[in-house]
Design a protein with these regions (language model features):
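Short gly/pro/ser/thr-enriched loop/turn and capping motifs at secondary-structure boundaries
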Residues: 10-12, 41-43, 68-70, 152, ...
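Hydrophobic residues at beta-strand termini and immediately following loops
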Residues: 36, 64, 74, 174, ...
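A short, polar/charged loop-to-alpha-helix boundary motif
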Residues: 67-84
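CN hydrolase (nitrilase-like) catalytic-core segments centered on the catalytic cysteine
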Residues: 1-68
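ATP/NTP-dependent adenylation/nucleotidyl-transfer catalytic domains that generate, transfer
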Residues: 30-31, 56, 83-121, 126-377
């Protein structure tokens, strides 16, 4: 019998890969195996435990739980574990959610933060981040901050308040409008930049995000709590985020979670208990930085965007191979261009839980400065 002492980090569907490798070893050697695995979060990595044993026939005889420390006695006969009744495995979506919770819990706790702060916008990303934070740390350790502007819809305020009530979280509200107006006055008077010019659109949108980031960091400095950022992998991939704005914080909970997976996780969490108002999930996503704005003004629909990102980043497909999958050439070209153009933003993003085999981290190696062009035309 072989005892394996492992520190194998979680990835989506990683356990199936562990089973396969173990059975291949047993088939080659005829040796039964007890595979023990580390549990806990370490920076971007989450170790899921899920220790198990297999007999010489490659049958699973013992299976410990995921994301929890556990001790189990194993009866051994003839140098192999005696088979026991196994609990039903978790759904993959449940494992993903637990990985995110454990990552937040251990990063916050092990680094000595007394709690966490986040900006609650009334949108789906901040809603999921808040749910994860509360499940990880407890409602008494979390403060949510709503920072509306003239572009914030009234239903965003209502939904944010409802969610805070459902989770029992303290919700602070601070309008950024006075600060935003004063910034624009100073910029116009000191730098002669008219705030209503077309060229100023990006400036005024990013300015709102940076005011919010500054307020959150001020609260963090006052309380000692860590700021959790709420951007998802889809946005970070194509740069649909603001440096020193919504990217400002200490830990990026959804850094490796695509937008389509965000929706699936919201639905999963609400199946346990209703904590995210349905309207948050059903509304068209919007940064609410200008009138009547939606994400799809700037990006392809998320189901298309995420599929292209997964093909290019996750599966290492060429642009031509992605187009051959019946994706629009213009969409493919735009997404790949944005991925490489925004490398500089990703380099400055905070760490976050890694759940996939390619998270723009250790397995992604592209320079910021390069004249290389993906497209020849």
């Amino acid at each position: 019998m072989l005892l394996v002492l492992s520190a194998s980090p979680y990835r989506i569907n990683k356990q199936a890969s562990r089973y396969q490798i173990t059975r291949q070893f047993i088939e080659q050697t005829g040796i039964s195996i007890i595979h023990t695995n580390l549990v806990g979060g370490q920076d971007e990595l989450v170790f899921d435990g899920a220790s198990f044993a297999m007999n010489r026939q490659g049958e699973l005889t013992h299976q410990l739980g995921e994301f929890v420390e556990a001790i189990e006695l194993i009866d051994i006969h003839n140098n192999q574990p005696i088979k026991t009744e196994l609990a039903a495995p978790q759904l993959p979506i449940a494992s993903i959610y637990q990985a995110l919770c454990l990552g937040v819990k251990d990063y916050t706790r092990k680094n000595g933060f007394p709690g966490a702060l986040l900006g609650l916008s009334g949108g789906v990303d901040s809603a999921l981040t808040l749910a994860i934070a509360v499940d990880a740390l407890g409602a008494d350790k979390i403060k949510a901050v709503m920072m509306p502007s003239q572009y914030t819809a009234s239903i965003s305020l209502k939904d944010a308040n409802e969610m805070a009530e459902l989770l029992g979280v303290e919700l602070l509200e601070c309008s950024i409008q006075p600060l935003f107006d004063q910034f624009l006055l100073n910029i116009e008077s000191d730098f002669q930049i008219p705030s209503d010019s077309t060229a100023s659109n990006t400036m005024t949108e990013n300015l709102q995000a940076r005011i919010r980031g500054t307020l959150l960091m001020a609260l963090s400095n006052h309380s000692g709590s860590i700021v959790l950022t709420t951007g998802n992998k889809s946005e970070i991939a194509v740069g649909y985020c603001t440096l020193y704005g919504d990217m400002a914080g200490g830990f990026a909970v959804l850094k490796d979670v695509s937008k389509t997976l965000v929706y699936a996780l919201c639905e999963y969490r609400n199946q346990i208990s209703r904590v995210i108002p349905e309207r948050i999930i059903q509304r068209a996503p919007s940064a609410e930085l200008r009138p009547n704005q939606t994400d799809q003004d700037s990006l392809p629909p998320y189901e298309i965007l995420d599929a292209i990102i997964e093909a290019y980043v996750g599966n290492n497909y060429s642009p031509e191979e992605i187009i051959a999958l019946n994706y629009n050439e213009a969409d493919v070209q735009k997404v790949i261009h944005l991925i490489h153009r925004n490398e500089y933003k990703r380099r400055q993003s905070p760490p976050g839980v890694r759940i996939t085999h390619c998270d723009f981290g250790t397995t992604w190696h592209y320079p910021i400065t390069s004249s290389y062009k993906i497209w020849s035309t």
